[in-house]
Amino acid sequence: MPTHVSKTRKLRGHVSAGHGRIGKHRKHPGGRGKAGGLQHLRSHFDKYHPGYFGKVGMRRFHLMKNPLWRPTVNLDRLWTLLPNEARDKYLGKNTEVAPVINVLQSGYGKVLGKGRLPETPVIVQTRYVSRRAEEKIKQAGGVVELIA
């Protein structure tokens, strides 16, 4: 490439060669990284990163999740946790596949033994179960699975 058209040759005689008078092509003129986000780079941060600075809401220091949380459901309401189609499919029919009722997904933590179950095997997944409820489920041919 001929030297008489290169940029450095063109800029001979112009003191700062296109790099300005004060900074003179030195160091990090805007600061390093995200420096200046609240000062000289504020318009960029406001436009492209809204909500980057500041706090929102309150922090609850001593918040304890309830260790005794266990809403209960009785055996007589157990089959209502299944959708209608599944209930019609399994109740009263002699199938080899048993329905799985996950009590935790329905918002309950413990199964209690009030009421009667139909004589259809069922797999109950729960976190806690009473002794009578477990006996009645096993009498109906079902199984209780304890899940975390």
Curated annotation (Swiss-Prot):
GO cellular component: cytosolic large ribosomal subunit; preribosome
Main location: cytoplasm
Gene3D superfamilies found in the cross-reference section: 3.100.10.10
Chain intervals for the UniProt region annotation (Disordered): 1-36
Subcellular location: Cytoplasm
Keyword Metal-binding: no
InterPro entries, sorted: Ribosomal_uL15 (IPR030878), Ribosomal_uL15/eL18 (IPR021131), Ribosomal_uL15/eL18_sf (IPR036227), Ribosomal_uL15_CS (IPR001196)
Signal sequence region: none
Superkingdom, natural source: Eukaryota
Gene Ontology molecular-function annotations: structural constituent of ribosome
Compositional bias (Basic residues): 1-13, 21-31
Keywords annotated in UniProt: Cytoplasm, Ribonucleoprotein, Ribosomal protein
PROSITE patterns xref list: RIBOSOMAL_L15
Pfam families in alphabetical order: Ribosomal_L27A
Function: Component of the ribosome, a large ribonucleoprotein complex responsible for the synthesis of proteins in the cell. The small ribosomal subunit (SSU) binds messenger RNAs (mRNAs) and translates the encoded message by selecting cognate aminoacyl-transfer RNA (tRNA) molecules. The large subunit (LSU) contains the ribosomal catalytic site termed the peptidyl transferase center (PTC), which catalyzes the formation of peptide bonds, thereby polymerizing the amino acids delivered by tRNAs into a polypeptide chain.
Subunit structure: Component of the large ribosomal subunit (LSU). Mature yeast ribosomes consist of a small (40S) and a large (60S) subunit. The 40S small subunit contains 1 molecule of ribosomal RNA (18S rRNA) and at least 33 different proteins. The large 60S subunit contains 3 rRNA molecules (25S, 5.8S and 5S rRNA) and at least 46 different proteins.
Family from the record: Belongs to the universal ribosomal protein uL15 family.
Protein name, as recorded: Large ribosomal subunit protein uL15A
Protein source organism: Schizosaccharomyces pombe (strain 972 / ATCC 24843) (Fission yeast)
